[in-house]
């Protein structure tokens, strides 16, 4: 092999160039991905030894190539040799042979393929060795810093196992820390040493952080030297930064002392002798404490407030009284060229000012409740820094103000809309004026500042001010009207739009959008400038800028139309014209094309008048006609033309209007049934409008062609029934009658189709069109044809409704009489009896002047029919008829109480009635009491269809009457009777599928009590509760937040086999083990699977992983759900899978090794295949997401096994899904 030849060439050559070329070629060959994949180091046993020797080659160039080779093959080093390889590299670093040993070691440790294996011995071998090496080196040597960097980088990867660190190794860590902080003044080394100690303290054993507390307590003491304070602050800073990155890491030892540390830092900040660099660090730590630890800000506010004011204004080189609120605006106006006062390159006081402002920002971002206090106390100080002589201070002051104004609406929403006694007790404001008045004042000062900006103001500051002004205009609570002119003047600071950076262009467009949204009268004065900017932005090559500019232009159109609907300025017209020109060109971005179509069509609709520019309108129609033929824009163009023709009803006023109209109509007809469903809908909607507008201009032959086209479309297309029928109803009756028989046959065939599902609108349209083209004598034949439909009773209801509407339209009592004879005849077929019963339930007896009560009794008598379909039809018809009269409600209740008929059938009647009717509280209350009476005595209630029907009826009653009946549901759930609890849960579950906005608060309240029932010893109650929880996760996710932790722990406790529910049953000579809780456990796993969709679950993935691995040892269905959970976990967090990769792969191996035999039953065979396919899905998902050699090795075994074909199929499925 070529690798062996190259290694031999290196070993045997004394020429450094040949050795270099040999290793260079070897590195190039190894770097080939396909070659590396199949490389096995066992074929070249001396490879590693040779490469490790090459790291100390006499030639530096050869050493570097050796480092490359070691880094590339590190993922191929066998596990049994990996530890010795790392130890050899550590020996090379310790022996000071070459710095390339360290480079090679660093690259190996950072290789994700070897990390799972190194993780096993990092804490016991690698980390202590590093510490010993650091003790040997002099801190002044450059190698010391290089090794320290590698140690810190590796800790970031391998800190998860530091909990096993031995005490003597921690002492080494302390020695290194002390060596760095006492023998060295180099800032970077001290910072790395602090990171080293903080990481070990956060992730190491308990004794580790005791030392760090001692260091902090000693360093932050009142009489400590500044050098020790400096070290302690840097150490505390690193700990807080680590806790910010790793939210799950243990920082309890900081949290317990947070108040003490905060007070100590405030005391240190008061010391005037503290240098600016230390003050900067103290402020950084203070900001982190306030933002990420629960500091009680109210307790320290008087001290903190005064300190921040002094530090924000801290400038020893300038004496100025700018803290007076009355003088702040004058100060900003006078100091418009503040930076030119003096230049002092050694002055770093600006860092203190900047860090002080960052502390304010930390409070605003993390502690919303304190926003009014912060603005009132510190707002003027922050605003005063808008003209600071240091650019970075100006920028951070702008950011503070921007974030404060962004949070004002949120504060008002959360705190100013409720009467919060607790806030008043704590001394926190809850009145809207507490924040509004201060904000309005600050906005007025900012407005004056913006209006006085100098030409010398840096572009970066003007750009950020632009963003600040955008935020101000976007808010409705900051009083922008009084400062409109001053604030909006910032637009004129950018005279040449074409030369601006793309980010500033975007921000300008967003500012214009915000200005338009505020709706001030003064906008008219800026119309010219804003039109010019938007026009230039639309023409830009950057799609996002063009798109946002177009959306803003559309808002501008609506604003102009609202203010001056008949008077459009020249600049505004030019802006629209340039957008139309862009639409004519071949612009590639689809989003921009769609926005352009929407803009030009809305412009026509908004400003169309009899004297509207007909040439412009003609151009718009021609362009849209072209877009109608381009596939990506067909639907949008069709809808735009719809809207335009609904406004422009007289096409003769358009130049060549009739010709353009005919072209659009022909194009519409050409594509109406050849495109996808979305486009068909759009074309049909356009055809409807075109027929309304220009029917009188169309030849009879063309109308006949359109009719034929619509009939053919109706035959094939069951998705667009409504749109097709609307078009048919516009065609003149004389044309329709020519194809009467064909049309009726098509409609009947359409109705008899098993795939057709009609809504209320389509039923009305069908009734109308049949009535338009038919005569009364045709009616009986048409209705009889409906009975031939092979549909279940529930679907025949729709056909019966059409028949009933036709009877009412023609006022045909004769048909009713004929149907009644068929109904009463004992010789009538069942299907005729079913259909007639359903018709009687839907007739409008008032219109027909027929006695409805007679038909009520006739229908009710069929509830005892020997045929099940007739009984069901009678139940549905009775419910429909009940919705016509309050008298029938009482009669239906009486029938239910009488026990003369099957209660399940009568529940179907109630269900039908409640879906159609709105009833008052008294009636709802009465029905509830009747339906829910004596349910505790019903046997097999949990599995009975009766429970489902009853739950739906009661659920509809609750949603019908909103909250009034919720107390009865709560009474049921608090009952000790199992049937009561089951009913309350199933009613609640059904109500979750309905949209009842008024019930949201009651739903949350009920759920927080009811969800605990999944711990109920009654397994049926527990299972129904789990079904409820799954439904809540899907439909009312917000209800989960407050109960998440308790729910998760409860589910985990129920996920394992409960021995108290397992018993042995003797069946003949055999004994069978029965697990009564298996259904409950299945639902627990389903609930956990659904719960993974809640964002909070990302903080508890370890629990899900443990449960899913345990579930792989359970019964078949639970194994399947566990595999689905695992697949989700791989998507959520591949790193957590890496931690348990061996356990997971072992569980997958057991499943994939399952085999079918000749004696295996088909059911068992299918179950095995389902399991194996699910396991293979998890494996391939792991391969995609986790970069781990163990997974690759396992995959190669699967590809050689009996399920290799299934695995390839699953790979293709997943890849196709990802592409889609």
From Swiss-Prot:
Matches recorded under SUPFAM superfamilies: ARM repeat
UniProt cross-references to InterPro entries, sorted A to Z: ARM-like, ARM-type_fold, CAND1/CAND2, TATA-bd_TIP120
Protein's cellular compartments: Nucleus
A Pfam entry, by short name: TIP120
Top-level taxon of the source organism: Eukaryota
Classification via PANTHER family: TIP120
Protein's name according to its UniProt entry: Cullin-associated NEDD8-dissociated protein 1
Organism whose genome encodes this protein: Schizosaccharomyces pombe (strain 972 / ATCC 24843) (Fission yeast)
